[in-house]
């Protein structure tokens, strides 16, 4: 960890994560990596509370971070840092929209390049694709001495574009990331550029860490705006489409977000819907349907073969608390299928029935 003052890159990280600063951490998700900022903070004021320090550990993306329930929740513990000059520019302001791309991310060259490329009718322009990939390679090479910061910012830019892009128009973005992984950046020593012994861009080093930082939305939040709900759907669609292209025999494949699929399906079909409002249950089921629409084969195959996850991250929902489930399996897949079939036949909302029928058809034919 460096002893240098806060860098622009660290400020970008904190601005990004700081949007939901009072609500961290969320068990089931890894902590945010504001390590440099916190180290600087510790020299300016008494140590921050443990819940904030816990956000700053470097975690492996394959590690589970679940609470005893296995479900994410929002912490209500918060503390003011306004007395610390260096933190004034990093803390969220009340008048800043909760959703959207902040100025720090919008100013990134990678964000500008990618958002320009993805602004299409949903089809991929091959020439523009190669040009964008080359630009990302060049930017990574120029950032060799600060590759960790560069990757963190770049992945935030990628997910920012995903949040703004409807599912039906995400193909260029997914194609871009797949093509990017087929390239390797050469370091100044003539060897492949690496971070944590992972190759840039083949292994997408720390991509999973950034994803987990972002997966902090709560479908039970009745105050969520329409824009926020749309961003949840878009992020879920993006992760699902990546999972559909992942090598599922390799649990470390950076495209494999199957654990997130399980969380979505669990929230929709394994909790007592009577205890949830119609609105929150509707959001949860919509996210589950998005996964079943974009990654039906992956979800089916992992359920048939069996895929357990570390710790309690894959445990069952409250309706099935007595089941010894730690991940995806055939019995659990059957529960999801039965729930969807029931919704498709009994839901009072016509749109819900239609979505459920589409999801049920995906499950029956895969």
Summary of predicted features, one role per range:
Residues 21-24:
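Tryptophan (W) side chains
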Residues 94-327:
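Eukaryote-skewed repeat-based solenoidal scaffolds used as protein-protein interaction platforms
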Residues 332-366:
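Eukaryotic acidic, Ser/Thr-rich intrinsically disordered low-complexity regions
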